[in-house]
Amino acid sequence: KMVTVLLTAAMATAMAAGCGKSSDSGSDKKESYTIGIEQFAEHGSLDNCREGFLKGLEDEGIKEGDNLTVKYKNAAADMGTAKQISDSLVSDKVDLVCAIATPSAQSAYNAAMKADIPVIYTAVTDPVAAELADKDGKPVGEVTGTSDKLPVEEQLKMIREMLPDAKKIGIMYTTSEANSVSAIEEYKSLVKKYDFELVEKGITTTADVSLAADDLLSKVDCITNLTDNTVVASLPTILDKANEKKIPVFGSEIEQVKIGCLAAEGIDYIALGKQTGKMAAKVLKGEDHRAWILCK
């Protein structure tokens, strides 16, 4: 089996956009809160986001079991389920929704936009492509959060240094995930600079992963992962097949390296979630958010 040889953690930049219910004075603050956490899939990076999010809230004096009630729901990487969860949390009139991963962020925002419920997202690769911000990076409504945009050029540079003779690099991605489509476009713009040819393989569900992996592995010298929820949830299958063919697989964050990817230039998702939790605490406490702007 392949062994972990390298991991470089790159902290993501927080993206702050107008969000949340503002109050004119401290007397309007609630003493306790109910929030919904909608997570698109269960895998290491998103689980770490959730863990960090709750730690960030706790650092700001909002602690589950004390003055915080959490309604956690997981969509199991299914868009239809994500919509049901979003609608349910809005129906429950939670004080805030934390949406983890791009599909859940889109679903939560669409459900909450007319209900005056703020949405704080995390692990969203490209808020503009996901239509959570406009083309200038300005907020589109009651939504803000943090981005886990991939350091694509650093990843390509690392792969080239580790595999000087590799020619074809493969990427599997979910065609319905805006974050993945955006990342693919960035890879396309940079692969030639590092003397690679990009081979893409699109899928729609986890059921496609096994055959897609077989096809991709027959055409490439290595594979690099995105922060694609459907693919990452099926990563053990891809790694097993890649190990049989002795084809290295590069991850996009530390949890993927822990389970067998060769290396990654990626993000500390606990720290990302923690930063998001601190942002959520400010919204819950009624801090005036109108001065917040979306950073690049």
Regions found by a protein language model. Name each.
Residues K1-T34, D59-K63:
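Short, low-complexity disordered leader/linker segments with a strong preference
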Residues T34-E60, K71-G80, S176-S180, T230:
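Extracytoplasmic "Venus flytrap"
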Residues I35, F53, T144-V191, W292-K296:
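An alpha-beta-alpha
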Residues T69-S91, G202-L216:
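Structural motif
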Residues N74-D134, D228-N243, I247-F250:
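Beta-alpha junction/loop-to-helix N-cap segments that form part of ligand/metal-binding clefts
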Residues A129-R160, I259-K274:
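Short beta-strand elements at the ligand-binding edges of bilobed clamshell
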Residues M172, A178-E253:
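Pocket-lining segment of extracytoplasmic ligand-binding domains
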Residues K282-K296:
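Hinge/cleft segment of the Venus flytrap/periplasmic-binding protein
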